[in-house]
Amino acid sequence: MENRYHGAWTVPLSHCDDTARLSVQGALSQFMDIAALHAEQIGVGGEAMAQRGLFWLTVRSRIRLYARPAMMQTVTLETWPGAVENLRCERFYTMKHGQTLLAEARTQWAVLDLAGKRPVPVAPVYPPELILPEETVCDGAYAPLRGVPEDEVCRYTVRSVDLDLGCHMNNVAYVWMLLGTFPSAELHRIREMETHYRRPCFEGEMLSIRRRRTEDGWQLAAVKESGETAVAALLRTAADAAAGAAENP
């Protein structure tokens, strides 16, 4: 059983920004796509999980970008499952051009029992013959992301196009929503984005999008009308000169 997915990918127009280079949300979207593909290959894809009454939930994600490939440039993608700790597990991702690392990411997942609406231990979900690689990337403890910024930027209504097969807002749709509150020049400076998914959101729900400046970027949150935080995020940004350099892999 292949415990890693490895493949070439040509950056499409749909994943690029106004500079004709891969966007933050485009990179994360593609990483999620290859995670789903590899899950199918090792027997824990969406349909197989549904037959067992189970569903994958994204708990946290982090992506770091070092250089953004241009539209129609071919890069190499890799993903593999990582450590399992009771109710949580990790998955790792890399994007390279030759030997040059362009981006890396990690996601933390949980498995939901659909009948009981509760998380279950992850280890029994994986096939017993699957050997989990020890290699990790995008290292470092997840940020605590305590507190909620006070300044409201806008309000956002969850739309039908934001939903995934779980009938709630897709994890990458949250990223699109949060990044859409910034001008394009600020998006070009993003070097890291960490996102914590705390409460599911459903079609028609209204979210208050809030943010505040930090020493090296932004803290963001989307808050439900009930006062619950649906998603929290941290952006780390670079200076203008570094941002320009990072667009030339």
Please place each PLM-identified region on the residue numbering.
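Hot-dog-fold acyl-thioester-processing enzymes
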Residues: M1-T58, E104-R106, D113-R191, N248-P249
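Small beta-barrel nucleic-acid-binding modules, principally OB-folds
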Residues: G53-R68, R189-P200
